[in-house]
Amino acid sequence: MWHDRWQDVRWRALAKSSRPILVGPWRSELGFETLYWLPWLAQWRHRYGISRERVTAITRGGAGAWYDAARSVDLYDYVPVAKVRQAMLRDSAASGSIKQQASTDWEAKLLPFIAQDLGLRRYVVLHPSLMYRGLTPWFNGQMGQTELLTHLRYTDVPVPAPPLSLPLPEKFVAVKFYHRHTWPMNDEIKGWVVNAVANVAKLIPVVLLESGLYADDHVDFPLSGPNITSLAGHVTPQNNLAMQSAVLAKATAFMGTYGGCQQLAVRLKKPSAGFYAKFEGTCYAHKIMTEWLAVQLGVPCFIGTPNDARFVKEILG
């Protein structure tokens, strides 16, 4: 995107102005938000000298805490979780993807209401579609990592402290196993997950990062047992992602489905193990970036199948 001369001229003009900037609304995948959107915004602000005081982040589930912005707005204060989920599913049906490749009509109608509540009359919108437009060549295998990294700036992700009302063990493993196309909730995988989590719980307390909300097409595996506690019941739509990140930041390690939560764990510099059954219907570039980032941060990161994990265990004795 930086190489688009006319877009570059536009951003430089914006940098010289004092107009407030509404960033978002982000309503899509957690992994893309942490792996690409946040570092893309950081690089954009750095390149054009945009002050954080001008930025209002619009996201959901309390994830505004992760943004280096003067303030944040939660989508769920304006739109129910079910309607945001329905919008994602409509996008998927229309384009085959839930990625925000373009601004939708309902987003265009919502933003003026948010601006009015913020007391803004003249403002600029930085929509996620701009990031997707710039990084699509990477997702499609037409951009090298060296060029990709000119678009991204990885900085520490700020997270809130967990509330005092949430009892957490001194040391624990955060766990989030959920159904997705690479990790379907069939009997074989469900049995493996139940056994794996129970084995971990024999060694160290387990805290499940489950919300009880149906914000997307992911469904948490039902887990319970000795030394296992759940975040469900302690979260609301407006704070569920903030709470999950707060707990994850306190964890000793993360284990779960390979995907967005593991990518957040890597961003938070937590050792992680993420699992898939078949690597289909997802972009290999995201796995590359997750592993690359873990190497840069010096954080252990395993991504593989149960058989891969079994092989590592056997070869190490």
Where in this protein do the model-derived segments appear?
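Active-site and donor-binding regions of nucleotide-sugar-utilizing enzymes
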Residues: 6-119, 243-246, 261-264, 275, ...
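Well-ordered, non-membrane alpha-helical segments in soluble/globular domains
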Residues: 37-44, 188-199
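Catalytic donor nucleotide-activated moiety binding site of glycosyltransferases and closely related
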Residues: 58-60, 170-171, 175-181, 191-241
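Short, aromatic/basic amphipathic alpha-helical patches
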Residues: 62-77, 109-110, 218-227, 285-293
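Short acidic-hydrophobic, aromatic-tinged amphipathic segments that line or gate anion-handling sites
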Residues: 74-86, 235-236, 295-310
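A nucleotide-sugar donor-handling region in carbohydrate enzymes
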Residues: 99-179
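Nucleotide-sugar donor-binding patch of glycosyltransferase catalytic domains
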Residues: 231, 262-317
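Acidic donor-binding loop of glycosyltransferase active sites
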Residues: 249-255
